[in-house]
Amino acid sequence: MGQTGSGKSSLLKLINGLVPHHTGGILSGEITVDGRSTRMHRPRELADLIGIVGQNPAEGFVTDTVEEEIAFGMESLGVPREVMRKRVEETLDLLGLAQLRNRSLSTLSGGEAQRVAIAAVLTMHPKVLLLDEPTSALDPIAAEEVLSILARLVHDLGLTIIIAEHRLERVLQFVDRIIHVLGDENSGQVRIGLPQEIMAQSQSAPPVVLLGKDQVWDPLPLTVRDARRLAEPLREKLANLSPPIRKSAEIKSLPLILEIKKLVVEYEKKVAIKGIDFEVSQGEVVAIMGRNGAGKSSLLGSTVGITPIKSGQVLLDGNPAQELKGKSLISLVGFVPQEATDLLYAESVLQECTFADRDSQVTPGTTYKILNQLLPDITESAHPRDLSEGQRLCLVLAIVLAAAPKLLILDEPTRGLDYSAKLRLIKILRSMANEGRSVVLATHDVELVAEVATRVVFLAEGEKIADGSTLEILTSSPAFAPQISKILAPGKWLTFSEITTALEQN
C-alpha cells in the first residue's frame, strides 16, 4: 500500500526483474526469488517462477480470444499440450470464465479482462504471483470471489502473492502482512508489519478502520464482521439521529442535460444495451453500477459517440449527440475513459497542460492548477508515460475539467487513486454539482458512490433494473453497500463523515 505514485508498481517490477532490465535505472542491493537473483536473471528467465498482472491487463494481451490468451503463457514455457488443456479447463472454472472462453478479447469489459489476465498467469503455476490493483475493475462480488480463490491457493498450495492495492477495504481481510511504501518526506522508504499495526499508524485507511479509530474500538477492526461485534453502542446512539438528506428530489426538477431514449448497443451480435431510457438533470451526480459486463461502459461511450448506437437517441442539452462536433462538444461534455492513458500524447506533464489550455481556450495555467488540486506533488517535467496509472488518470481528469464542461462522464475514475487523491476528486465533483454542472460515473467503487452520488442507476445484462436515491439503492444491496452501511445496519448510514457530523451536532 502507499499513496499514488509512491512506487508500489515499481516495487513489483523490481521483484520480477522488469526493473532494471526493461526500464533501465541503477539497481543497488539484491533481490532473490526462490534462490534466483533478479540482477542475474532477466524476466523471461523468471517466467516459470514469477507471474505478474499489471494495472492495465489488456496491454499485455497478445492473442485474439480468451482461451488462446489463457493458454499462451504455457505455450511459451513449452508445457505439453495435454497438460495445457487440463490447466485451461481448471482455470476457466476456477475464475468463472467458462462462458467467455470463445469471446474476442476486444469485446471484454475491464473487469472481465482483469480476470482473464489473472487466469493466464495462474495456468503457468508460478510460485510467486504479483498483482497490481487486481480488483480495480472488478465489481464487489467478483472482487470477493477472486480474492477468496487467491487466498485458497495461498493456503492450499503455498503460493506467495504480493498485491499492490488502493482499495484496502477489499483486501485487508485476506492479507498476512502489509508493506507500506511511504511518500512525501519519507519517499522511497517502507514500513512492514501486521495489518493492525500498519493500519493503526496509517493516515490512509478504509472506512471500517476510520470508524474504529474514532470510536477507540479495541482491537482495531479490519473487517465489517469485526466492527459489527463492537458497534452495538454506536448503533444505539445513532438510532434517533438521521443522516443528511441529499438534494436528489429538487435536482430532478431542473432542466435535463442528458436524455437517452430507447438506446440499443450491439457488439458482434451481442446486445450490450437493451432499450434503455435514462435522464440526467443539471447538478446531478449519477453513479452507474452493476456487475462486470453489465453494459456500463457501453452506456457511457454511446453518449459521446465512441460506442456505435444500433437504435435509439442520445440528446445532450437538447441536441442530438451525433450532430455535436469540436468545440461545441468539448464545452458541453467531458469524457474520461477507463483507459485514460490513450488521451495523452505530449512529451511532458506541463506540455499536456499547456496544450489543454490552448484547446479549451482557457487562461494559461488553468489545467496545471486543477492537476495540482488532485496531485499536489506531481513533477511538471515528467513524461506522461513515466507516471503511475493513478497519476495519468489525474492528468487526464485535469485536462477534461479545464474546459469546464456542463456534463462530465467518468469510467472507473478512482483506478490508481489513493484515499487522499480520491477525497480531492470527491471535493471537485461536489463543487461541480454545486455549480449546476452534472456528473455521470460508472464505477465499482461503492465508497466513492456513497460519498458523492445523488442517484444510482443499476444495470444488469444491458437493462436498467434499478434507479433511485443513493441511500435507497446502496443500503438495500448486500453486495454493493458501503462498509459503514453494513456495520450500522439496519440504520441508514452511508459514510464515516455522516457519522461524525451527526454525533458532533448532537
Language-model segments: what does each one mean?
Residues 16, 304:
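Helix-to-loop junction immediately C-terminal to a conserved catalytic motif
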